A protein has these predicted regions:
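Active-site loop-to-helix "anion-binding N-cap" substructures in soluble metabolic enzymes
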Residues: 1-394
Length: 394
């Protein structure tokens, strides 16, 4: 995993450095409401500024149609927020590869920054179009990828352009690959993996890969009901994937054969409807009422999961235990987050997506060893899939 070239030690003075960042941040009324991803790119940006580079930042934001400018997807607020964070002027180009971008880049002095407009305003970005790659490459003398969140996409700005310029990894991307790669290649044991979320179908590859790597796998979230079905339990009106029951059973068997502990809920919080004001009850996992749905793990399960987490020396968590967005069903996710935070002996790695939202919600982010910035990218790396954005830097 260590064989990607990083920007550290590279002479960037006076060079136009084209940097793919992940500024896909939430914006409301023209203001960035969560700047986590912008902050995550600061070490690379500040390193380049200090080294005297002419820094050209490019990113996507949201899912525009790809037919040109759309006000709600402009990166202008992200550029403004970056300027506030580094306390320096940041130029903004009203296009990506057009006249304004070229003019703003030409006007840069060493150590100055321009942010280009949303890459995905041009549909050629997602198609990794050769012509578009060439146009991007003309804007820089070297290329840096620091957008781990999109490293699993073979787009023009993540893969195509890297073939046309001297290409390096930024500090964020290199750190992600090193941490997640190290976790898989040589984890301190016991290695405990906690997997939640609603669908087994989304996590099959990850669970399969972790059965080969982990000592204990903890299952929560909506997908636990497909596993409970595989064990022969009735799950009422809970979310279930009938087509995946057999596959879930195979994974339970594989774990058993490998001597991997696979923990499933022994009790669940059930509700009569999917709503904050639902009538709720706690019942054992083998006696769920036929007219109710499971929306969280129960207290007995919380205690068992917390005990297993406490034993880990490497703890990886991806996916909530229940519908933590609703107060009535947040307790299981909160209990797991607290258990992970409380394990001071372990390397604790939060694998992107909803788990990050959860540790932020419960104000526990600072207690974790490492929080991944990539949801899909972290999962694909854990699954053992090559990431186009990383492969392009080898």
């Amino acid at each position: 995993m260590a064989d990607i070239k990083t920007i550290e030690g590279v002479d960037v003075a006076g060079k136009r450095v084209l940097v793919r960042v992940d500024f896909n941040v939430p914006i409301k009324d023209g203001v960035v409401t969560d700047d986590t991803r912008i902050r995550a790119a600061l070490p690379t940006i500040e390193y380049l500024v200090k080294g005297g580079a002419k820094v050209v930042l490019m990113s996507h934001l949201g899912r525009p149609a790809g037919e040109g400018f759309e006000e709600k997807f402009t990166l202008a607020p992200a550029a403004a927020r970056l300027g506030e964070l580094i306390d320096a002027p940041v130029a903004f180009a009203a296009d990506t590869v057009g006249d304004d971008a070229k003019a703003k880049i030409a006007a840069l002095s060493n150590g100055e920054i321009v942010v280009l407009e949303n890459l995905r305003f041009d549909k050629r970005e997602k198609k990794n179009d050769p012509e578009f790659c060439k146009m991007l490459a003309e804007l820089g003398d070297m290329y840096v990828n620091d957008a781990f969140g999109t490293a699993h996409r073979a787009h023009a700005s993540t893969a195509g352009v890297a073939a046309l310029l001297p290409a390096y990894a930024g500090f964020l991307l290199a750190g992600e690959v090193k941490t997640l790669g190290g976790m898989l290649d040589d984890p301190k044991r016991p290695f405990v993996a906690i997997l939640g979320g609603s669908k087994v179908s989304d996590k099959v590859g990850v669970i399969d890969a972790l059965i080969d790597k982990a000592d204990t796998i903890i299952i929560g979230g909506g997908m636990c009901f497909t596993f409970l079905l595989a064990q022969g339990h009735e799950v009422g009106t809970s979310l279930k994937e009938e087509d995946w029951v057999e596959r879930a059973g195979e994974m339970l068997k594989k774990a058993e054969e490998r001597g991997v502990k696979m923990l499933l809920p022994t009790d669940v919080v059930v509700a009569d409807k999917f709503a904050e004001d639902a009538n709720t009850a706690t019942c054992t996992a083998d006696a769920m009422p036929s007219d109710m749905m499971g929306l969280d793990i129960g207290p007995e399960t919380e205690a068992a999961y917390a005990a297993a987490i406490a034993e880990g020396k490497t703890v990886f968590w991806n996916g909530p235990m229940g519908v933590f967005e609703m107060k009535a069903f947040e307790h299981g996710t909160k209990a797991v987050a607290e258990a992970v935070a409380a394990n001071r002996e372990a390397a604790t790695i939060i694998g992107g997506g909803d788990s990050v939202a959860a540790v932020n919600k419960f104000d526990l982010a600072s207690e974790m060893t490492f929080i991944s910035t990539g949801g899909g990218a972290s999962m694909e790396l854990v699954e053992g899939k090559p990431l186009p954005g990383v492969e392009a830097l080898r």
